[in-house]
Amino acid sequence: SLVLRRKSDCPVSHLAAAGLETIAVRVPANATAQAILGAAGVPIAAPSANASGKISPTEAAHVQESLGDAVDRIIDDGPCLVGLESTVVDCTLKTPVVLRPGGVTSEQIESIAGSVAVSDGSPNKPASPGMLQSHYAPDAAIRLNATSVDVEEALLSFGAHRLSDIGMERNLSPTANL
């Protein structure tokens, strides 16, 4: 997503830009999304496919779970290729600033735009919607340094030591070498 200065005659509603003087523009890589945008012939302003404050969906089923009957149609073109939010780059400054890391890396941006800065993640005033710390907060309890795992929990582990033979475990590195 590119954060750009909003022109005075910009036809996009201020509501779609959260009342900001900037506008965030996204051009999806997905061929189906590009075909829809091309057929529309005009810019499309749309919210995220998840309820505010929830983790971004990566499959159509996640959108259905999050939004339910609030939407009439969901276009299922398979799972997202990258399970992250979009990279957000503020292009209103002399040096572009990566406001939120995502599927496009700073190195990829630098290969096109030259030098970029990276935000510390705490803007005084968000430059685009979706930039609040709580916007993508998971709605789940997290326990750190757990010494046991309950039946309804999943375990994210590291190293050879296992707490149990539970079914929901993801080991980041069995050799403890990332």
At which residue positions do the language-model features occur?
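Active-site-adjacent structural elements in enzyme catalytic cores
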Residues: S1-L178
